[in-house]
Every structure is written in C-alpha cells, then in structure tokens.
Amino acid sequence: MKEADLITLRRQLHQIPELALQEKETHALLLKTIQGLPQTYFTIRTLPDLPTALLVKVQGRDPQRTIGYRTDIDALPVTEKTGLPFASKHSGIAHACGHDIHMTVALGILSYFAEHQPKDNLIFFFQPAEESKNGGKLAYDMGAFTGDWHIDEFYGLHDRPDLPAGTISTRLGTLFAGTTEINVDLIGKSGHAALPQNANDMIVAAASFISQIQTVVARNVGPTDSAVITFGLMRAGTIRNVIAGRAHLEGTLRGFTQQQIDFLQQRIRDIGQGIAASFNCQVKVALNQGGYYPVENNDKLTKNFIQVMKDDPDVTFVDTKPVMTGEDFGYLLNKIPGTMFWLGVNDPDSQLHAADFSPDEAALVPGVTAVVHFLEHRMLEKV
C-alpha cells in the first residue's frame, strides 16, 4: 500500500470506533480490505465464538516456523475532541488509544506479504476487546492458536505520543505492567451517629483498610522495584447522622512481573482478613486480573529485534523504560514468546486515552517498513 492508501484507510477506521466485542463495522471494513488484496497465499479465518476477531494466515514458501503479528481493533468510551474532519461518527466513542493506527500498520504489512510471499508462515491476528473484556485471553483460551494456526513467536506494537513519528522503541523484560481490578465490600452494622457502640462503622473500617494497603508497596516491595496500588472510588453512608453499615471500594493494582502481582494480590487478601478480624465485620475482596498480565518481552527474540532495528539505516530506535499502563498482549506473551514495541506518533501535547489525542499519520509508512524489514530478516535466521 502507498502512503495515500494507508492514510485513507486509517481515516476510514478512525471514523467508526467501536467498543470491546462490538467491533462489527470495523470487522467488516478489515475483511473487505483484506479480501481486496491478492489472495494467492492467504487463508482467512473467523471465530464463531469471537465473531469480531479476524485471523489471516500467509503461507510461507519454505516455512520453518510461524510468526504471529497482532493488532487490537477496539476503541474507548470517549467523546472525541480533535476537531479533525474525519473525527468519530459514533457518539461517545473514539479511537483515543490509536488502535486505528495499529490496524492500518498491520494492514500495510499484510498487503506487502500478499504480493511478496514470505519464507515462513505469517499469522495476522486482528484482536477485539483489548481495552476491556480480555480479547487476547478469550482467543487463546478457545484454541485460536492451535493446530494449523499454532504460532511460534508473536509480535505487536503500540503507538506512543511522546516519541517522534516513526520512532521504534522497546526493551528487554517488562514493557507494560500487569493490572488487577480490586473490588472490596465491607459489611458491618448501621446505626445512629450518637450511638456508635450499637453499630459497626464501615467508613472507619474502610479507612483502616486503605491505610494499611498503602504500606504494602512501601514495605513489601523492594525500593528498586516498582508497583502501584490505588483506590479511586469509595462509596459508604447515606446521611451525616447515620453510621455506615456498608462500604464499597474500587481500585487497581499494577506490577511489572506476574510473581510480584501474585504476591501483592495475596497481601490484599491478607489485609482484608485482618480488617475483618479487627473490626468484627465481613470483608469480601474480589481481584480480577483477566488477561492483563505484564507484557514481558522474550529476551532472545527481543535482543534480535532491537539489533535489527538498530542496524536498519531507515529506523530511528531509542531505548525506553517500562510503563505502569496495561496491555492485554501480556497474556499472549505469557503463552507464546515474543516482543512488543512502541511506534512513535508525535503528539507530545496529548496522551493516550485523551479526547484530543491525534497521532501523526507520518508514522504509518515507517511503521510498516520497519516491521516488514524485521520480519524478512527474522525469516532468514535459522530456527
């Protein structure tokens, strides 16, 4: 695809953002675009139990392995405020995380290999439900990557607004944190504010729970490691002179390794049990990680990826640090070795998930070219 074709496609995708597992228009446009490419080496597959997902296998001419490339396709419940002439047509929904860029780059790569048969097999996975609903986990757990669709190594990108357009960046180890949703219900006994001895105040219990949780990162995580536990919502009480008999908390846990996350999850449960004993109340702790595992890049594959990018005269590569945001590609990389990387899109005055986020389309061609060059180089290497 030429740059003009990529830009046109990106703008079409940008105008039809859809939420997780509802990506019907997006799926239809992707399928139409893919069916418009030369089909000589293609097998196109849909998943009955995940109907907005799409897989495309490109048959290699002398396959020694199967390399996967994944892009997410869903959008966010955000009202777009970019002022672009091709802004979202769907009220209250926007591609505020740049998945339109992700899809366009993937289609550009696919279009190249439609005309230039790869040495190894390639499988492109157009994944629904990254922002929520665990689309990667759903696909893997239903056996999408078994049999003829087995993948030996997996790659994928995420756009990054604070890097110049077309810049590539990644690192060994963790790139994105793993995340866990925390929901806590504390159940005591309501009563008159003047008679606290006859009630069991869950505002006090909840405050103690939150305070104790803050010691977990400070005292159970090494000073050179990183983790975050944040509570962003608390609901309790109905009026000033009634002691609250119930409290509800919602928060998030983030860490850079699954071992660390497992440990922190258990500490939250332990503190919940302690609060229940201390305040003679019920504490129900629900932790939901779903598919949001840490995005842990495979050392061997990522060293190779970085070296290829550094050796490519057309690529600007920069080092990066891990980030505390989450990405459900982590679940797939927990099952299949691979690498995730950043693609700079040059919107430094905005950020991912912001209503005014507007990635630079100048990143499209460099993104496609860099990945094509990497895949061709990778396929020349011995298994």
From Swiss-Prot:
The keyword DNA damage is assigned to this record: no
Alphabetized UniProt keyword annotations: Amino-acid biosynthesis, Diaminopimelate biosynthesis, Hydrolase, Lysine biosynthesis
EC number: 3.5.1.47
Top-level EC class: hydrolase
Signal peptide: none
Coiled-coil intervals: none
GO terms under biological process: diaminopimelate biosynthetic process; lysine biosynthetic process via diaminopimelate
One family name in Pfam for this protein: Peptidase_M20
Catalytic function, reaction form: N-acetyl-(2S,6S)-2,6-diaminopimelate + H2O = (2S,6S)-2,6-diaminopimelate + acetate
Pathway: Amino-acid biosynthesis; L-lysine biosynthesis via DAP pathway; LL-2,6-diaminopimelate from (S)-tetrahydrodipicolinate (acetylase route): step 3/3
GO molecular function: N-acetyldiaminopimelate deacetylase activity
Protein family: Belongs to the peptidase M20A family. N-acetyldiaminopimelate deacetylase subfamily.
HAMAP family: DapEL (MF_01692)
Protein name: N-acetyldiaminopimelate deacetylase
